Curated annotation (Swiss-Prot):
Organism: Oryza sativa subsp. japonica (Rice)
Domain of life from the UniProt record: Eukaryota
Record's note on what induces expression: By heat shock.
Keyword Cytoplasm: yes
Span of domain sHSP: 35-149
Name of this protein: 16.9 kDa class I heat shock protein 3
Amino acid sequence: MSLVRRSNVFDPFADFWDPFDGVFRSLVPATSDRDTAAFANARVDWKETPESHVFKADLPGVKKEEVKVEVEEGNVLVISGQRSKEKEDKNDKWHRVERSSGQFMRRFRLPENAKVDQVKASMENGVLTVTVPKAEVKKPEVKAIEISG
């Protein structure tokens, strides 16, 4: 898959057809560029501590009622929601529109040690924090075997 669009006249591969070009665009419903940007714009950090997996998503301007946190297929954490569009007045004259609106969704496959039945989520100052506790790692039990003979 080509990540950078080639435009060099001297590049012998510039005009090759890329069969994967546009594959991911077909997975997202046809929307405006602004809505597509919102879909991909939910930035999420994932860190692992000794006790849990912690996800932090920047969702400025999104109310907690507009966000869903779910675990599906047993171990896939799904963070999704909707950024509401600002109401427009007929008399308004926009000079610049940079804030995106529309749907967003992020999915994360959780490791086997995740306690998916104890997931907690909170939202403060536009930052969603999802905490997934980890199961304690059982240390292998060593059993001494007596040697006969």
